[in-house]
Amino acid sequence: MLAPFAYFFPRIALFYAVCGAYDVGRNSGLNLSTLRRYFIGNGFPTWVLSPFNILLDLLSLPYVNKGVYHLGDLPPAYQDEVKRLIQAARDANFVGQLEEAAKKHPRTMVFFRWYGVNKDTFFNVPAFHQPWKYIQTIGVSVFNKKVSTSLHFGFMRATLRILYNLNDMKDDSAYIVVGNTTSYWRENKLFIFDDTLLHQSFNETDQTRYCLFVDMIRPSLFPGVMRALISSVRILTQSFKFIYYQNWKVIER
């Protein structure tokens, strides 16, 4: 499919080749397997969106994309929202509310906010529905025992992915890998990263893992532009959200 496209549209093909080379080159530990996965595997949609994502990188300057972040790398107002959200999540009894539903499926997800719009679910957490300035998506993911994801890329860089493990893990068999970075949930409950980088989450423990799942608008001198783009994405993806989370059981009611 790619060869005929390059033959009939050589300039567009060259443009996409350059954008894709830059985009995939951001992954540390780059190898042939990563290239194959990006260009002809599950990273293909990320390649298709690479010009758009590069534009988002430019709009985010002077805040350079670090790939993997510490909380202190974010502006103070962003840090404050993250801390408030984490405290609200700690105060909610997610384990008790989700334990029974999660037993039926390897991976479960419940959303309280989706790209800037609050969602009604079977579990009411009023603190999640406060007017957030930067937080766009709030969910809780549940990994059953001995359940991991495959290696995959996210699609869009208008947001940063923020994960916070809600329950205490007993050993280092639960962790996330992004490029050359491995973070163990037993040691560090908070992990912030650009999810368009190749990543994989592991739960090889005998525990169910409950994780706060958040998308936060990237720091930018043009936050209004970022919000408008995110709103557009919400409208475009609302009716086929299942494609994003086809390997998850999304609980709504």
Predicted features along the sequence, with ranges:
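Transmembrane helix interruption/hinge and helix-loop junction motifs
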Residues: 2-15
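Non-heme Fe(II)/2-oxoglutarate
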Residues: 12-128
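A short glycine-rich, His/Asp/Glu-containing loop-to-beta-strand
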Residues: 127-145, 158
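Short, conserved beta-strand element in jelly-roll/cupin
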Residues: 142-144, 155-171
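Short beta-strand His + acidic residue motifs that chelate non-heme Fe in jelly-roll/DSBH
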Residues: 149-151, 174-175, 193, 199-204
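A short hydrophobic beta-strand segment most commonly corresponding to one strand
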Residues: 161-166, 192, 207-223
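A short beta-strand-loop-beta hairpin characteristic of the jelly-roll/cupin
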Residues: 167-187
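Conserved metal-binding segment of the jelly-roll/cupin
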Residues: 184-198
